[in-house]
């Protein structure tokens, strides 16, 4: 989307001899600095990944471009970054580009951490995309974006220790068990990204009452408080809330 009135700069990249340009908009939201990559042909569509039935045929190009443009912008800003964090196959090419295309730059020493939210979504595509996107073109196999990140990211994580262990074996690994096993020492599970030293019902200051596995009485008091706050009818039935 075009963000009128925001600061922006032009970013140009090369993908296997093809030149691409985009605008990167910079803004702050609740004190957090945000950079948004704008490219009308790639991203101004009704849906982000598919037409409702099938993935867009140019998805490999769209998201390889996004990854390399984001890295090029990061290089141009001359800021010091602690980590580059990618999520799922859409950012997987970034791990390869960082190690291979940005070697020798100020970004080269920045570690790339890759989070797998659903290992079934891998974006497997024909071998010719390796040449077109300049992703290990010497390899004569299909291009698997997720597998590329498993190979080149410095550290891997996923949504829980249980899911991490499941991905070590088929069929949950969806064909990539060997890669997960090879990176086992660098692969951790972080339960929903939640820090239980802070978000714990036994000590959370935002709750009306505290509770834990050994003393659950406070849970009923919390339910009573939210029912009153939302002006709901008080019943003995469970309270379900969806976000």
Task: Kindly give the residue locations of the regions a language model identified.
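Catalytic cores of nucleotide-sugar-dependent glycosyltransferases that transfer UDP/GDP/TDP-activated
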Residues: 1-243
């Amino acid at each position: 989307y075009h963000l009128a009135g925001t600061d922006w700069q032009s970013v140009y990249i090369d993908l296997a001899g093809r030149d691409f340009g985009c605008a990167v908009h910079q803004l702050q939201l609740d004190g957090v600095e945000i950079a948004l990559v704008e490219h009308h042909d790639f991203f101004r569509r009704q849906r982000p990944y598919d037409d409702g039935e099938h993935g867009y045929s140019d998805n490999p190009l769209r998201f390889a471009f996004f990854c390399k443009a984001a890295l090029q912008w990061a290089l141009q800003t001359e800021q010091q970054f602690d980590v580059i964090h990618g999520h799922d196959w859409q950012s997987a090419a970034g791990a390869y580009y960082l190690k291979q295309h940005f070697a020798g730059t100020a970004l080269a020493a920045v570690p790339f951490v890759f989070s797998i939210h659903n290992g079934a979504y891998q974006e497997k595509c024909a071998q010719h995309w390796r040449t077109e996107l300049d992703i290990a073109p010497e390899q004569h196999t299909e291009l698997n974006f997720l597998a590329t990140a498993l190979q080149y990211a410095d550290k891997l994580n996923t949504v829980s220790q249980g899911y991490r262990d499941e991905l070590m074996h088929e069929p949950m690994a969806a064909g990539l068990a060997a890669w997960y096993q090879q990176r086992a020492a660098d692969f951790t599970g972080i339960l929903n990204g939640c820090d239980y030293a802070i978000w714990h019902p036994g000590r959370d200051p935002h709750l009306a009452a505290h509770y834990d596995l050994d003393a659950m009485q406070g849970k009923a008091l919390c339910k009573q408080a939210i029912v009153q706050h939302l002006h709901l009818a008080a019943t003995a039935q469970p309270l379900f809330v969806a976000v």
